[in-house]
């Protein structure tokens, strides 16, 4: 019997659970899969227990070891891929490497504790890496007798979210008990269903990669006698068609405009190339020496070259093959963006003397050449070809 075909008719959304250690992120993940399997039995909705989610396999993403559990489930209207990172360090690494791009997240806060240090850090990281839609799940309400206390905790969470520029007064807060729902208490199961209905309604359907403006990182350039210059690479987002006007952005002082005269894949002519395709793009009016690896081909005006930005970075530990010693202000490694290395200097935040292997930190970077970057662009930090860190652009400065 063939496996059931993957159903593309439902919109797909990436979601995750975030919050302080032991506030119930993994229990909630187990509860969502279990309650949906009971209430909406489909081939996708299979119950996952706490132990199987908690024993997340190790993955390596850009040289960094991360434990993450991936589960899937569906509601009447959507298909969800859900990530749960068991450890705090795993969560930070996931966010910073872009290993887990979330369209929205469920912030789990234990009603018995209220917001804790990692609650704050996860909210800040969500803000920095561009997770714009948070839903709050106040967990463990069965352990709190005092209604006023729940109100105070909710106010405290809303204030904290507002402090980090989330719409604290307006975003949804749902009070429940993941453990009670998991144990089959129907009152608490109803609350899990309400949480999923809220996710369906509050987290907007993500824009598909093909609908975004074209971005094609240039990997290779060659010229075809009599036809012109070909740039090849994998289309990161958007689409490219013959006769499109494009810009060549980064590395050089000036952004150059050109027109696409051909799109090829596997030596065949195409009408258009889509996000994910490896293509060769024939460009009219571009000399072989006017385009190079490390630049990007982009929809005009959609992305600009920059030399200064702030980034959230994770520095690999010694065990992950990173540095054995700390680095200090004005450290000058290479920053690897998409297809190329560019040297840059690092300025540490005020009051931070040094950064140890295994730390995460906000840095200001100044590159020696401009590169096409925007908020959310990921990069690696390298020394002599060896990855020593990983980061994501949180703010453009110049």
Swiss-Prot record:
Residues the entry annotates as binding Mg(2+): 26
Annotated InterPro entries: EF-Tu_GTP-bd (IPR041709), EF-Tu_GTPase (IPR050055), EFTu-like_2 (IPR004161), EFTU_2 (IPR033720), G_TR_CS (IPR031157), P-loop_NTPase (IPR027417), Small_GTP-bd (IPR005225), T_Tr_GTP-bd_dom (IPR000795)
PANTHER family: ELONGATION FACTOR TU, MITOCHONDRIAL, ELONGATION FACTOR TU-RELATED
Alphabetized HAMAP family for the sequence: EF_Tu_B
Family, as annotated: Belongs to the TRAFAC class translation factor GTPase superfamily. Classic translation factor GTPase family. EF-Tu/EF-1A subfamily.
Subunit structure: Monomer.
Protein name: Elongation factor Tu
């Amino acid at each position: 019997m063939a496996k059931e075909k993957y159903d593309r008719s439902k919109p797909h959304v990436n979601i995750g659970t975030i919050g302080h250690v032991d506030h119930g992120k993994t229990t909630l993940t187990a509860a969502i899969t279990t309650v949906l399997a009971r209430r909406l039995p489909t081939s996708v909705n299979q119950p996952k227990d706490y132990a199987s989610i908690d024993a997340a396999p190790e993955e390596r993403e850009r040289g960094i070891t991360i434990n993450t559990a991936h589960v899937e489930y569906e509601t009447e209207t959507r298909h969800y891929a859900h990530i749960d990172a068991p450890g705090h360090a795993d969560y930070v690494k996931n966010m910073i490497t872009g290993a887990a791009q979330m369209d929205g997240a469920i912030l789990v806060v234990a009603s018995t504790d209220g917001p804790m240090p990692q609650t704050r850090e996860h909210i800040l990281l969500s803000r920095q890496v561009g997770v714009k839609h948070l839903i709050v799940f106040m967990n463990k309400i069965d352990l709190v007798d005092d209604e006023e206390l729940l109100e105070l905790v909710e106010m405290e969470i809303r204030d904290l979210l507002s402090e980090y520029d989330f719409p604290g007064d307006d975003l949804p807060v749902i009070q429940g008990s993941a453990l009670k729902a998991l144990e089959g208490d129907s009152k608490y199961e109803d609350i899990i269903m309400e949480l999923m209905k809220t996710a369906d309604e509050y987290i907007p359907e993500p824009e598909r990669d093909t609908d975004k403006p074209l971005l094609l990182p240039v990997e290779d350039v060659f010229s075809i006698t009599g036809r012109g210059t070909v740039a090849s690479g994998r289309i990161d987002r958007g689409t490219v068609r013959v006769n499109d006007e494009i810009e060549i952005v980064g590395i050089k002082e000036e952004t150059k405009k050109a027109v696409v005269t051909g799109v090829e894949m596997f030596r065949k002519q195409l009408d258009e190339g889509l996000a994910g395709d490896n293509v060769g793009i024939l460009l009219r009016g571009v000399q072989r020496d006017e385009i190079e690896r490390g630049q990007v081909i982009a929809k005009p005006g959609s992305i600009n070259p920059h030399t200064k930005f702030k980034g959230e970075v994770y520095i690999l530990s010694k065990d992950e093959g990173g540095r054995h010693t700390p680095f200090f202000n004005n450290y000058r490694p290479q920053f690897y963006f998409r297809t190329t290395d560019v040297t840059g200097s690092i300025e540490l935040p005020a009051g931070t003397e040094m950064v140890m292997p295994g730390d995460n930190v906000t840095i200001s970077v100044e590159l020696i050449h401009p590169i096409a970057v925007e908020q959310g662009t990921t990069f690696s930090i390298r020394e002599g070809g060896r990855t020593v860190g990983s980061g994501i652009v949180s703010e453009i400065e110049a």
